């Protein structure tokens, strides 16, 4: 006599998603918490066999239940953005104007600002909560060494030889650690008119939902050839540098030391990062319509396909381009939302706050 009993538990999946958006004058916080619980099949089979000799055999096999839970703090696709700013010249003023209108990196999910030295109070002034204060930033204790001279051996740029400053910025960003919770890390030049929402849409096909998944990848954004000696068909231009979290993971875990063994002293920081990513085996993804850059291929600020436009070194020119790219209604809607968010904060904390004007200029 053979008796078989089989019990099968079916798969159960429960997903709960909560989205909360909070904006303040200094930061924009978008929180998405998605908890997914997957319970897989559990099967228990008992077989009993009885023979005429009265011998009996019982076999029991059990597959235990497995529960997998995945939680995201930030929305998909999330951006951690940063800028490195020189404390003299136009950049602090330009950054203050961006901060007021919550433009560029200040509209990313999280952001950081680094400077090449401590800034005086007058250079970083912005109105916030009714007080004149300075933008929070992290000073870097190294100096830019000057402009590159292409006539010298090993020099690859006639722009600032700023690699040492950015090496320190990357070290501080990794030490800060907040970028680990985001899908992409984005370095933005202060004079780039940058739209984070456009970049998020652009990156969706390249982004895995799970934070532990996804390829190590960076975006090359310029295909211009600079003379017969130029052998690089695709380049990383520094106005907008986009890296997946796992690309920076490769850099953070031994990659930085390997890359700093290259002969980089005559390089700009964008060329260094491209050579570094290639050395570490990070995948290139080409998007030559991502930026409109006068140093590569210029584009009209009305071009809706572009994620960023470069370069605009004064606030008037910067926000003229920003307004053209947003369109009159888009710009007014954005500024109205900024004013509403700051009024809501004022009501919560009882502070008087200077709000951005209705004009985008």
Question: Where do the PLM segments sit?
Answer:
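Extracellular mucin-like PTS domains
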Residues: 1-72
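Short, acidic, metal-binding catalytic loop of nucleotide-sugar glycosyltransferases
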Residues: 97-108
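Structural beta-sheet core signal
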Residues: 81-83, 113, 187
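N-proximal low-complexity "stem/linker" segments adjacent to membrane-targeting elements
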Residues: 71-94
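Conserved catalytic core of nucleotide-sugar-dependent glycosyltransferases
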Residues: 156-163, 167-297, 336, 344
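Active-site-proximal specificity loops/subdomain of glycosyltransferases
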Residues: 112-183
